[in-house]
């Protein structure tokens, strides 16, 4: 993977980009990344997955070359909604995933069924456990996925 991306400095931009770094094996540099708790929790989960993370001001360095842990827990794992963005990246790289159910939403109940249904159409299989979501995808494949309604997060 190669290229440049100007990150806007918002958590809603930074968190999916951080999760996407797991799709490649290399060192990724992200500029203008906000220093807020959700970003720090995501960095902790990337470290649990085996990444090396460094920060210089608002610049992040993510080294994903050694990432090999599919079970992503940690202090922030179940505390924020964006944990769900790790599902596809970890499945794509490691072919299995285990994460706590996402939390942290004060808006109200926000189901994750669109995320799961989309990944199932790509070949993933999920098992719902009491506190965690487990998934496997031996061979992911392309698919046309149609959402019941527009969803920025599910996209």
Give each language-model segment a name:
Residues 1-155:
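Structural preference for solvent-exposed beta-strand-turn elements
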